[in-house]
Every structure is written in C-alpha cells, then in structure tokens.
C-alpha cells in the first residue's frame, strides 16, 4: 500500500507531500505528476513518481495500485475538471484503491455558486463509483487574497463585491495538513469534512489589518458585481474566470464561506493559522 497524491507539484500538493514526509517513510509516498522534470525535487527526497496526464486517460492505468490510499487534489483547469476527475476516478476504481480522498469546496452539494459546480459533479462521480471515499470540502485559502497584495498596496483599496460577508479562511498549509491526516489516519472513510478557519472575517476587517501592519491607509471599496468583473478583466483575467470570482464574492455576501465547523482544527490537531499571520508573512515577501 502507498499513499498517492495527484497534483503533487502544485501549490497545495507540495505542502501535502511535506506533511506526509514528516510522518510517513518516503518510500510509501507516491506523487502522480505530468512532468517528471518538474518533480525532480520530490524524487530527490525519495518520493516515487508516477507519470500521468489527466487529459489522456490511458496514461492513468499505471498511476494507482490495489490498496493505495489516494488523495485527488482537484485540478486547476476550470472547465476541464469534471472530465479530468472522471478519468482519475475510473482509473482508481479499476485499480481497486482502498481510499479516494477528494479536495472539494465548502458546502458540498449545497454550495450554490459557480465555482462549486465542478466539485459537486466530482463528488457525485465518486459516490457513483462505489469507492471508499473521504470528502475534504475546503473553504477559502487566505492566500487567495494575500497573493494579490501588490495592487491593493498600490491603490490603497481592497476592491470586491462581497458586501459585509465574512470569510472563514485558513492557510493553504492548514488544508494540506488536514489532507495528510485523512490519508494517513483511520476512521475517515465515508466522511465529508467541512473545512474552514476558526475565525471568520470581513473584507473591511482585512483592509483594516493591512492598514495596521503597513502603516498605509487601505480601505475596502465595495463595487457592483459588473464593475468588479470589468476591473478584473482589465487586470488581465479571462472574462469567464472574472465572472466566477465575482460570483464567489456574491456567495460571500450571502454567508456561504463564513461557516466555522471546527473540522479543520480537529483534523490537524491545532488551531488554524490566523489571518494576521498569513498577512504578515505575505507582506514580508512583497
């Protein structure tokens, strides 16, 4: 039996591998990757590489083995994920894996925003497959905001259409730790975890925190969804993705990313990373 992680060279995947290496012998860890060269650092740490491309299902035939515990990290190509995930689920079923854990989105089948559609479809694919599953319904990453600090600092404004909605975010490392815990621990089969930070915050509070830490005046500027979408497209985002992001903001305004179930802290055995900690780390890197 091996612990297998797909998307192992991505931002979340690399952190999951780090977590696994802290508790599991490297020889029991497998990284499924598209590009062997990109994964050279993982191989150097003793992680087995299995090369496969989600867009070419035939390459997935050797990605999994009977008894493997598999972490399916959701793909990053919005619009292609259902087909890609379907190929992985089929390959995992054919191999007879012991567990398929999937990183979905907060709310699962009840999530009512565009970004959730592919995640909901993937969860249904997994349920229909009959595979032993664990659903990791990830909330918002704090890094979704802190990765875009440059324009915020330049213009002195956090621009969004999220109203007074609150966001129970956590760091990417928190979600990685939970994923590692689920594929290395027991008692998680058939479970769906609603993962989010311990504390929800508003964008006005986020702007106030940025002001406090930087010493600059930064405000939350609420704009209509259509205007926000125009701003995002003007900044270079594809129109479809900009529409998804403004739709997420509307979901935030409705309270869809504010839930604090405590599942994330329980799985990791520690409090989630505070917003201020991630903000300070990001500012130090700007």
What are these language model-derived features?
Residues 44-47, 131, 216-218, 269:
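A short helix-to-beta-strand connector/capping loop
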Residues 52, 69-73, 102:
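Redox-cofactor binding/interface segments in oxidoreductases and associated redox assembly factors
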């Amino acid at each position: 039996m091996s612990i297998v992680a797909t998307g192992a060279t991505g931002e979340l995947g690399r952190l999951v591998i780090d977590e696994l290496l802290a508790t599991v012998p490297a020889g029991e860890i497998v990284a499924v990757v598209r590009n062997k060269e990109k994964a050279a650092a993982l191989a150097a740490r003793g992680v087995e590489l299995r090369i496969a491309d989600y867009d070419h299902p035939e390459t997935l035939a050797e990605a999994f083995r009977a008894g493997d515990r598999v972490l399916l990290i959701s793909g990053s190509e919005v619009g292609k994920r259902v087909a890609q995930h379907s190929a992985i689920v089929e390959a995992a079923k054919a191999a007879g894996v012991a567990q398929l854990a999937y990183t979905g989105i907060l709310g699962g089948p009840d999530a009512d925003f565009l970004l959730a559609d592919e995640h909901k479809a993937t969860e249904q694919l997994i349920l229909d497959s009959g595979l032993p599953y664990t659903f990791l319904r990830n909330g918002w990453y704090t890094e979704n905001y802190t990765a875009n600090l440059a324009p915020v600092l330049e213009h002195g404004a956090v621009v969004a259409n999220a109203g007074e909605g609150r966001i129970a975010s956590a760091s990417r490392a928190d979600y990685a730790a939970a994923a590692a815990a689920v594929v290395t621990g027991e008692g998680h089969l058939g479970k769906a975890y609603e993962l989010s930070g311990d504390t929800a915050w508003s964008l006005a509070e986020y702007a106030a925190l940025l002001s406090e830490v930087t010493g600059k005046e930064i405000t939350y500027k609420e704009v209509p969804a259509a205007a926000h979408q125009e701003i995002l497209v003007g900044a270079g985002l594809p129109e479809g993705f900009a529409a998804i992001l403004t739709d997420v903001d509307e979901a935030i305004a409705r309270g869809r990313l504010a839930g604090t179930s405590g599942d994330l802290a329980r799985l990791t055995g520690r409090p989630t990373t505070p917003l201020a900690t991630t903000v300070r780390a990001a500012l130090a890197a700007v």
